[in-house]
Amino acid sequence: MIETLYNLPFHILVPPNIKVRRFSIPMPSPMAVFSVILFSYFLVTGGIIYDVIVEPPSLGATVDEHGHSRPVAFMPYRVNGQYIMEGLASSFLFTVGGLGFIIMDQTHTPGKTNLNRLLLTAMGFIFILVSFFTTWLFMRMKLPSYLQP
């Protein structure tokens, strides 16, 4: 019964004979997908959502003992607040640390010489250490008594 109702318009109207090409999007390369994911990771860890909602200044300012205004890159004593440049610097360090882990993972691919494995391991380890200690230093700049007994 319902099928006859569906077929009724096609008995009255004749649909045109059109050849429609199938629309296809080429599959992106793995490096393009990785780049998009890494860039979105950079933006999210940099606090782009916070920056859009709160609209903080790019840099802060403080007055020294002589009355001069000095630029400040880190918002002191506030863990849940940031300047735009502070978020971008921290995000860059998180991304460098993540790249260090990815570089260290590349040492396990077959066909690498021992020298290349050693260089990749050293470079990945250096990326991770620089990222960790610089992020730790940034946290000490935000909270001067951070991890102090």
Curated annotation (Swiss-Prot):
Keyword vocabulary terms for this entry: Membrane, Transmembrane, Transmembrane helix
GO BP annotations listed: protein glycosylation
Membrane topology according to the record: Multi-pass membrane protein
Entry annotated with the keyword Transcription regulation: no
One GO CC term on file: oligosaccharyltransferase complex
Family matches, as InterPro entries: OligosaccharylTrfase_OST3/OST6 (IPR021149), OSTC (IPR042416)
Topological region Extracellular: 54-83, 139-149
Pfam families referenced in this protein's UniProt entry, alphabetically: OST3_OST6
Cytoplasmic side: 1-32, 105-117
Compartment annotation: Membrane
Annotated TM spans: 33-53, 84-104, 118-138
Function of the molecule: Subunit of the oligosaccharyl transferase (OST) complex that catalyzes the initial transfer of a defined glycan (Glc(3)Man(9)GlcNAc(2) in eukaryotes) from the lipid carrier dolichol-pyrophosphate to an asparagine residue within an Asn-X-Ser/Thr consensus motif in nascent polypeptide chains, the first step in protein N-glycosylation. N-glycosylation occurs cotranslationally and the complex associates with the Sec61 complex at the channel-forming translocon complex that mediates protein translocation across the endoplasmic reticulum (ER). All subunits are required for a maximal enzyme activity.
Quaternary structure and interacting proteins, as annotated: Component of the oligosaccharyltransferase (OST) complex.
Entry similarity comment: Belongs to the OSTC family.
The protein, known as: Putative oligosaccharyltransferase complex subunit CG9662
